[in-house]
Amino acid sequence: VTKVFGVKRVEAVEVCQVDEKMQPIESTARIIPCDALILSVGLLPENEVAQMLGVELDPATKGAVVDQTLMTSVPGVFSCGNALHVNDLVDYVSLSGDQAGESAAEYCKGDKNAADRVPVEYDRAKFLYVVPQYYDKAAKDGMTMYFRPRSEFKKQSVTVASGSDALINKKFANLTSSEMEVLKSENISDRITDKITVSMEDMK
């Protein structure tokens, strides 16, 4: 979009093709009458401060690597919202902000035991990313897990397991990378005997 026409409301827009440097090609300009212009703008987490503190980042999310309390690889440093990973809804941003705040308050009180983290692993051919990347057994918390599928899948069963114990299982009629999905569990620390794995398979 190179121009927007209208005074009190949108009446039309001018659109152009772009060259390899993303510059408009004026000879391709055309006018499209319309009454609204809707912009869908991608986001990338900004983590310059986290990097300065030595926080480990996940190449898949561009955000911090965290456990279920949202604590990063640096003790006492927590990450949430779109700085952690891009959320679809502001509701999820608010919820993770509340969670990070509560976790930080507990940490400041000195109630947090020494970390006993186990990794969360997933099939990278099917999942774009999974957050959190670790579960801290010492925290004895439930877990809210966010994920995006790598592409579109239909009639899938997603399982979070530790060894042979299925901690969470949820069925999805449709999965697409444009929609973030959420999995939740109560306290599972006593059931974790090994690393946590997240898998996806055709629904039976």
Give the predicted meaning of each segment.
Residues 1-9, 76-79, 83-89, 95:
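Predominantly flavin-linked oxidoreductase catalytic cores and closely associated redox partners
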